[in-house]
């Protein structure tokens, strides 16, 4: 029970550390490109209350991917339209990647030099053990959530950041862009629902094979762990291996 509470608290903190800077980065990039909309509406801030979205928060907590309240942006205010659209779209995920890069070694340090080196002492002092676990779970969850949000948001489906990238790189008359703009949100909802159903079947019915039918979950976990996350843990594992 205590382990569950620790994990839950760590997850809540991790979600805030991932989603709030993500939205702030969008607002900051838009502001730097000439659009003051986010600043004038009070969204150029790290105050989590300003960015809170209940549905996105709950989805992130239960499925591992979600969103905060979208930052209001008016691309017509950008000094250079396509550049502004592109940099604003990718600002959030780049911020998440940087945060994940920073948090992974913090988690490693806590695990190796606090938990592993003092495991016998911690086992005799449960309160300190739970504290050490919490201090480890927080940066590790931030690392994992950050990569998940990175991969999830780069899906080229309206209204995700990936679709904004498509908008920045294609003509308004591009057929693929028009299709994604019109049906992207429906595809996204379908993927989320399908992923949730598969997760519930796997968890409560014990059907592990269903994970291979979880399209969104399989995509996010595979890309986040084996592609996007590989440079981070590969680099830091190499650095720590030198000592």
Q: For each of these PLM feature ranges, what is it?
A:
Residues 1-243:
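Hydrophobic transmembrane alpha-helices and their immediate loop junctions
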């Amino acid at each position: 029970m205590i382990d569950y509470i620790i994990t839950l608290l760590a997850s809540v903190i991790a979600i805030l550390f991932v989603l709030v800077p993500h939205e702030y980065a969008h607002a900051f990039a838009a502001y730097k490109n000439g659009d003051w909309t986010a600043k004038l509406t009070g969204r150029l801030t790290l105050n989590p209350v300003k960015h809170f979205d209940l549905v996105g928060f709950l989805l992130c907590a239960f499925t591992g991917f979600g969103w905060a309240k979208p930052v209001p942006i008016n691309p017509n205010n950008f000094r250079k339209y396509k550049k502004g659209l592109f940099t604003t779209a990718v600002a959030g995920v780049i911020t998440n990647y940087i945060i994940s890069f920073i948090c992974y070694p913090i988690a490693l340090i806590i695990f190796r030099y606090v938990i592993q080196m003092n495991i016998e002492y911690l086992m005799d002092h449960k309160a300190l053990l739970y504290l050490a676990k919490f201090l480890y779970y927080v940066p590790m969850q931030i690392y994992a959530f950050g990569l998940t949000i990175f991969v999830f948001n780069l899906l080229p489906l309206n209204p995700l950041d990936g679709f904004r990238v498509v908008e920045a790189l294609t003509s308004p008359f591009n057929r693929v862009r028009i299709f994604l703009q019109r049906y992207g949100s429906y595809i996204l909802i379908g993927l989320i629902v399908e992923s949730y159903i598969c997760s519930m079947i796997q968890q409560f019915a014990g059907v592990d094979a269903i994970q291979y039918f979880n399209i969104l979950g399989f995509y996010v976990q595979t890309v986040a762990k084996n592609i996007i996350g590989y440079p981070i843990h590969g680099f830091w594992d190499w650095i720590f291996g030198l000592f």
